[in-house]
From Swiss-Prot:
It is an enzyme of class 1 (oxidoreductase). FAD-dependent monooxygenase; part of the gene cluster that mediates the biosynthesis of depudecin, a highly oxidized eleven-carbon linear polyketide that acts as a histone deacetylase (HDAC) inhibitor and makes a small contribution to pathogenesis. The reducing polyketide synthase DEP5 is the central enzyme in depudecin biosynthesis by yielding the backbone polyketide chain. The monooxygenases DEP2 and DEP4, as well as the uncharacterized protein DEP1, then act as tailoring enzymes to modify the intermediate polyketide chain into depudecin. The gene is DEP2. The lineage of its organism: Eukaryota, Fungi, Dikarya, Ascomycota, Pezizomycotina. Its cofactor is FAD. It comes from Alternaria brassicicola. GO terms for molecular function: FAD binding; monooxygenase activity. Keywords: FAD, Flavoprotein, Glycoprotein, Membrane, Monooxygenase, Oxidoreductase, Signal, Transmembrane, Transmembrane helix. This is FAD-dependent monooxygenase DEP2. Induction: Expression is positively regulated by the depudecin biosynthesis cluster-specific transcription activator DEP6. Its EC number is 1.-.-.-.
Length: 528
């Protein structure tokens, strides 16, 4: 009899972070696949990818981690700075995250990461470059992908990992609205919004900047994010767009060198730290480009025999460094879903209905809440770090140092340890003070099995210091808002008292608010 896994074929479209990770996952599951990309593997555009601990765990499981780590160094501390470059919060951020998860946080050139993932594939002949998709035709249990040059690929499932401007998504939308008119609404098509753009660049090292640190420098409606490595620095300048320049799909902003230079000219003199201004980074730039920052989550992640993953269905702003890692989570969950479905019926290929049921329950519905929370975390961080409104200014400038970056690091760790891994590969994962949620669940299931077999009741105890991921399953939202709420009430009471009894209310805390947002602002740089 034929093995369903060996005869079922997946066509992956898009050889970015999601597509290459998925290719590795399918190879480990012995599921046949091809990977198509309209361009080349590892293009030069883009700057970096930051691998959070859960991304590193996935790479560890796939056997790619050592090769990736050979091309990058660890991250260590973090500093938050005001418009003058002065520090108002700092800690060993990434060391704290590692303490709770067991894995480092790494940042490396995106091109190097993609090239490494490609070279680690067991069969590179499955990857086809310059394969631009023209049409996807579903015919009973098969799908045909037709390229612009007339070449065709036939499989049983298409997975679109072709990014935020996905061609596969547009085809899926058309198929869905043809079969079920009104299924994909205008609201969903416009769910990804662009309110910020960014300059993404890399430069050579600058004296005065740490070689393993993250620097966040806030300004009025823009911010600088630096990820420093010994040989280079990754920089992202997040810039709030005027309302008349904000947009949704299908508008796609394309920026020229002149557009980028215009923004640079307004921020050239802005401090990054107390000893470095942005102009010094710009002079040392190795590459730079200006891009739109889309953000949002779509409702429908599949239809028929087409499934979407990664930026094609959700997009997060880069401040949280969760976008690529969330895409890798998608790849893992898609592979787990397929592996489970094919293993349950090893002698036949699943029907379209069976595929849709599996991806609805085990992929779309299972991940929707988590992905929405991640996108919200990224958006909130972008706006807080850019002082986008007085409430966000208060959170970033005044509540962050009170709450402490250790709390933020712990919550990032909590978000990491609730991420998925492949269900069909055993490996010795690293562990920290927080246990990985899926590992804890598997251990408990095994223990319950032993109970049933041996009639022995196991008692589970949580160490005061060894917390399970359930304690942090809400990520940022588990602790941060409650603390902020209490602090806001406390601060409001003090501020009202100050207003009522002081004739010099614009001083101290209030003075900084006035200086940051006032018309006579002389200390902060403003990009309009």
């Amino acid at each position: 009899m034929e093995d369903g896994r060996s005869t079922f074929k997946v066509i992956i479209i898009g050889a970015g972070v999601t597509g290459l990770t998925l290719a590795h996952c399918l190879a480990k599951a012995c599921i046949d696949y091809v990977l198509l990309d309209k361009g080349i593997v590892a293009p030069s555009f883009g700057t970096t990818i930051t691998l959070q601990p859960h991304g590193c765990r996935i790479l560890h499981q796939l056997g790619c981690l050592d090769a990736v780590l050979a091309s990058c160094d660890v991250m260590s501390g973090a500093q938050c700075r005001d418009p003058s470059g002065k520090t108002f919060a700092s800690n060993d951020f990434f060391r704290v995250v590692k303490k709770f998860t067991g894995y480092d946080t790494r940042t490396l050139d995106r091109k190097v990461f993609l090239r490494t993932m490609y070279e680690q594939l067991p069969d590179q002949s499955r990857v086809h470059e310059r394969a631009r998709v023209e049409e996807i035709i579903e015919d009973n249990e098969k799908t045909r992908v037709v390229l612009q040059d007339g070449q065709e690929f036939v499989g049983n499932l298409v997975i679109g990992t072709d990014g935020v401007h996905s061609k596969v998504r547009e085809i899926m939308w058309d198929n869905a609205n043809t079969a079920k008119p009104g299924m994909i609404t205008v609201e969903e098509k416009r769910a990804m919004v662009t309110q910020y753009n960014a300059i993404v660049m890399a430069c050579s090292p600058v004296p005065g900047l740490g070689s393993h640190d993250m620097e966040v420098t806030s300004n009025d409606k823009f911010s600088f994010l630096l990820l420093c490595q010994p040989d280079w620095i990754s920089i992202i300048v997040h810039n709030k767009l005027p309302e008349d320049q904000q947009c949704t799909w299908p508008t796609r902003r394309r920026y020229t060198e002149s557009d980028m230079e215009a923004l640079v000219s307004r921020i050239l003199e802005c401090p990054i730290t107390e000893t470095v201004v942005f102009g010094e980074l710009w002079k040392r730039r190795l590459k730079a480009q200006m891009i739109s920052l889309e953000e949002g989550v779509l409702e429908h992640w599949f239809f028929g025999r087409i499934v979407l993953a990664g930026d094609a269905i959700h997009k997060v702003t880069p401040n949280s460094a969760l976008g690529g890692n969330t895409a890798m989570e998608d790849a893992v969950t898609v592979a787990n879903t397929l592996h489970t479905l094919l293993a349950a019926h090893p002698n036949k290929k699943p029907s379209t209905v069976e595929l849709q049921d599996a991806f609805r329950d085990n992929y779309q519905n299972a991940r929707m809440d988590r992905v929405r929370a991640i996108v919200k975390v990224g958006g909130d961080l972008t706006r807080q770090q850019a002082y986008d409104g007085w409430k966000r200014y208060l959170i970033q400038r005044w509540l962050t140092p009170i709450v402490g970056l250790d709390t933020l690091a712990k919550n990032i760790a909590g978000l990491c340890v609730t991420a998925p891994k492949l269900s069909y590969i055993d490996f010795e994962e690293k562990r920290g003070m927080l246990n990985w949620q899926d590992t804890v669940a598997a251990d408990k299931e095994l223990e319950m099995h032993h109970e049933n077999v041996g009639g022995v009741r196991a008692e589970y105890h949580k160490s005061k210091w060894l917390l399970t991921s359930a304690d942090w399953s809400g990520g940022f939202e588990a602790v941060f808002p409650q603390i902020l709420g209490v602090l806001m009430v406390m601060w409001s009471s003090v501020w009202l008292f100050h207003l009522a009894f002081s004739r010099h209310c614009i001083s101290g805390f209030g003075g900084e608010v006035w200086r940051t947002f006032g018309a006579d602002n002389e200390t902060s740089c403003v990009a309009k």
